[in-house]
Structure formats: C-alpha cells, structure tokens
Amino acid sequence: MTHPLIPQIINLATPIAEDRGLEVVDVVFQTNKRPPVLRVDIRNSQGETSLDDCEAVSRALEAVLDESQVMGGSYVLEISSPGISRQLHSDREFISFKGFAVIVTTEIPYLDHKEWRGQLQGRDESAVYINQKGRAIAIPRELIAKVQLDEHR
C-alpha cells in the first residue's frame, strides 16, 4: 500500500525536477527506519543523470518540504537515479552527499571488514565518517580504496 504522503511529495518534487529537465520516476517513504527515509528517484530522459542533478534536486526539494511541513518531523531525504554508481573524490562531493548511502571499500581489512555500508557523515584529513544503523564509524583515509554512492539503498 502506498503511503498517503507519496502523492503530495510527487506534486512537490515534479516541478522541481522538471525545471531542471528531469523527471521523477519513483518515490519511496520508508517509515520503518528512524528517522524515516524519503527516497526520490529521478532521471534525465535525454541523457545521463549526474550527481549534480541529484544534488540540485535534493537542495531544492529539502527546502520545499521543510517550508511546507508536509513531513511533520525529522526525516532523511535521498535523491538518487537508476545507474548512479560514481565514486566520491572531492571535498565538494563529500559535502554534497552527506546523508547519502555509501559503500566504503578499504585496501586491507579494518575492524575485520573490507567493505562498509552506511550513511555518509563527512570526511576530514584523517578519516571518512559514516553512520551504520545509528553507530558512528570513522574509517582511516589511508586505508580507503574508494567511496561510492550505494545505488541499492
């Protein structure tokens, strides 16, 4: 059954996407998570959907959702596109995609794992920080092989 807020969210997200030459292809509201996760999938029917497209829609939709108070409380907003699996490299990307689901792969096992999945919290000169099911994890940068968006979450 579709969550009752989905039609309202689609009505708010569609003009934002269309203003950028994009379309909303799916909206999922995961109320079983704390805070709830609102995922809006977008695509560019004329070509590839870029991370910049996702970032622009995320910033604009977040402002509209907060202003309209349709969400009624705290939530996590994720904007994604089928097929985005790009690695994050620049400080700008790490700032832009804070809160997004990522996969961090290490060169050697760190705390018995070579792959970490969680929500990106940030990066500094010493570590990449993720939130994994409410637990904060700092992964030393010198061990990291790559950080990429998790397209399956």
From Swiss-Prot:
The keyword Cell membrane does not apply. One of its GO terms (cellular component) is cytosol. It is found in: Cytoplasm. GO terms for biological process: ribosomal small subunit assembly; translation. It comes from the Bacteria. Keywords: Cytoplasm, Ribosome biogenesis. The keyword Cytoplasm applies. Signal peptide: none annotated. Required for maturation of 30S ribosomal subunits. Belongs to the RimP family. This is Ribosome maturation factor RimP. It comes from Rippkaea orientalis (strain PCC 8801 / RF-1) (Cyanothece sp. (strain PCC 8801)). The gene is rimP.
